[in-house]
Amino acid sequence: MAEITASLVKELRERTGAGMMDCKKALTEANGDIELAIENMRKSGAIKAAKKAGNVAADGVIKTKIDGNVAFILEVNCQTDFVAKDAGFQAFADKVLDAAVAGKITDVEVLKAQFEEERVALVAKIGENINIRRVASLEGDVLGSYQHGARIGVLVAAKGADEELVKQLAMHVAASKPEFVKPEDVSADVVEKEYQVQLDIAMQSGKPKEIAEKMVEGRMKKFTGEVSLTGQPFVMEPSKSVGQLLKEHNADVTGFIRFEVGEGIEKVETDFAAEVAAMSKQS
């Protein structure tokens, strides 16, 4: 067995753009023959996948599944809406979700490691970067899920509610984007940050500090209601809050999770004219 040196791994990385561990594995399998390693990597799609890895994957799908008293939600990203609808991509996402449910896996790194070879092969076949971005689970007495297309997914856990009510609550979460269950759940740092923003606004209006502070107290109550599920107007009956709805049904929401495709990912905006100009200079 030939010695796989650091310099050999470095050379293969520079020539293929693949990761260090992928290069080391390829060299080991090729007994240190770098040309054979490159050929094998081309056949497996590893080189093509490495080249695609730098592309921003901000499109994709959200998948949900309820298994007894535990529900799972998963986001898998690709680069375009076209690939997000591809049967092969959808099947890959379904397979990852099934594995998460079967193994009760909530560590996305575990899923990434488990499906890396299949991901690389799919990248080579489809021609876009693909990323298993995040996975989460929710336990509860009564569980409900809702998907708005494949781009928004919601899980809701409740007590004392029937399945229809939980489904409606999940639809509400999808539409209204609450961040917390109840106003009192809003974290202290979020409250303090908003308080300072509102105080600055009130002070800029020329009000004395004492009056400004009283104004802000009223605004903060409104703010914590707006960002919490129970404080929001129910989307299907805006005349009542979600909290009032739950009280009528003698029910309580114990938790929810909302995923939206690509949230928090910055998409690269391509300047087509600049791209063409750059290409013309190279030719």
From Swiss-Prot:
Compartment list: Cytoplasm
Region Involved in Mg(2+) ion dislocation from EF-Tu: start-end pairs: 80-83
- Coarse class of the primary localization is cytoplasm
What SUPFAM superfamilies does the record point to?
Answer: Elongation factor Ts (EF-Ts), dimerisation domain (SSF54713), UBA-like (SSF46934)
The GO cellular component terms are: cytoplasm
Q: Which InterPro entries match?
A: EF-Ts_dimer_sf, Transl_elong_EFTs/EF1B, Transl_elong_EFTs/EF1B_dimer, Transl_elong_Ts_CS, UBA-like_sf
Q: Which Gene Ontology terms describe the biological processes this protein takes part in?
A: translational elongation
* Record key words, sorted: Cytoplasm, Elongation factor, Protein biosynthesis
Which domain of life does this protein belong to? Answer: Bacteria
Which Gene Ontology terms cover its molecular function? translation elongation factor activity
Return the similarity comment. Belongs to the EF-Ts family.
Q: Entry's PANTHER family?
A: ELONGATION FACTOR TS, ELONGATION FACTOR TS, MITOCHONDRIAL
Record's function text = Associates with the EF-Tu.GDP complex and induces the exchange of GDP to GTP. It remains bound to the aminoacyl-tRNA.EF-Tu.GTP complex up to the GTP hydrolysis stage on the ribosome.
Protein name from the UniProt record: Elongation factor Ts
User: What gene does the UniProt entry assign to this protein?
Assistant: tsf
